[in-house]
Amino acid sequence: MKQPVPSAHFDGFPREFTDFLFSLRFRNTIDLLPENKIKYKALITEPLTLLSNDLTQTALSISDTLNVKPSKCVSTMYSDMRFSRATPLKEYMYIRFREPSCEHDILGLYFDMGCEGYSYGIRIYNQTSAGMESIREGVLAKRRDFTRELEKLSSHGIMIVGDKYARDHYPDITDNNSIKVLLNMRSFHMCWDKAIDETVFNRALLDEITCAYRGLNNIFLLLKQALLQN
């Protein structure tokens, strides 16, 4: 009796991927595209798709409306030829679990990686000033909830990164730095940034991102609720 073939799971990126991505800085040409495509598929596209598949249930446990189709979530190997005609392949990779399509302020979980480092967390795609104002209103309306989650995440090393106002727009808030930082952002994302290390070459990367996504559950839902008012 023929045994069923077990489904594949993510077990790390091949060690060669860093050297390959670095080499694309110098060898990413149309002439070398046939050779590079074969390597790209094996070293990046295939393991990245497995990683996305293995993160899917965690993403859906945070928000069951996230788009988790690999064709929508996993970066393709090809650069946008409108802007990168001479360099046909991407020199980085990403996974995007985003809320259903709309024109702006699209909340999502992400993972990015290049040859030197990787990052994961929460992004808001096509962020607008109106969307940011909705978030500020949500923060102020649920100040205690946001404070609890931001302080918890800060203790675990998350960063709020983005474009800040030149001056403090909330000088009256003197007892809550985590809230003040978020309120004074024009745009932002929440992330953990890591250097490439042994983690990316085995299943530990999946475990690390899974744990981080679960820790983002409450802040993700708070941001989602705030943006629904936009």
Regions found by a protein language model. Name each.
Residues M1-I30, T49-S52, L140, V161-N230:
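Long, solvent-exposed, polar/charged low-complexity segments
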Residues F22-V74:
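Active-site acidic/histidine clusters and adjacent loop/turn architecture
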Residues E35, C115-Y120, N184-W192:
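Glycine-rich, often proline-containing surface loops adjacent to acidic residues and nearby aromatics
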Residues K37-I44, I124, S134-V139, F201, ...:
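Short histidine-centered catalytic/ligand-binding loop motif
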Residues L55-L66, S154, L222-N230:
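Surface-exposed helix-capping loop/turn segments at secondary-structure junctions
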Residues P70-C73, S79-R82, A86-R96, I106, ...:
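Soluble extramembrane domains of integral membrane proteins
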Residues D80-A141:
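Aromatic- and glycine-enriched beta-alpha-beta binding-site module
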Residues G114-T174:
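Compact, glycine/acidic-enriched structural inserts
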